[in-house]
Amino acid sequence: MFDSPKVNDGFGLMFAAGYLKTMTDAYKLKPGEASAFIVFRHFATPLGLSDDIWKKYKLGKMLDIMDPATKKPSERNFVWKPNAGDMMNTDASADKMVAMPGVVIGVCHYAVTVLSGMAAKGAGVTPEVALKEWEAGVIPGAMLVPSGVLAVGRAQEHGCTYCFAG
């Protein structure tokens, strides 16, 4: 269980990818025999949202997240289908990770609610409209969890080990 409360250049994904690679290399496990639950919560929540949401709601500006290519506030999710140089390890991108057997990406609904409400006025919509758009804008294959903290706790209750990845 990889707890990602900060963007941290996408290292939450890279920690999970490193763990899975180590499990297959060191223990000769096959893909899917080890699992990783990555939780994007708090200010890392936008890593679980589409480029359209990033652009419309100016998430880079709102949360001081710089685009690795332009060095300006990001208007895109640089861990989803990244360009060369966007991440230290583009093999650990969210689109590749969520497609791997045994990998689940959870996106904190509590943070989605709070952050969408904060961003609504700047996008010219009501908080209710923003929330619906953000809920619909979760990256394909990821899932909304009631809250990131709840997901972290419940995962541990069910035997997952904890890794701070933010």
PLM regions: where:
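Secreted/extracellular ectodomain signature
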Residues: 1-166
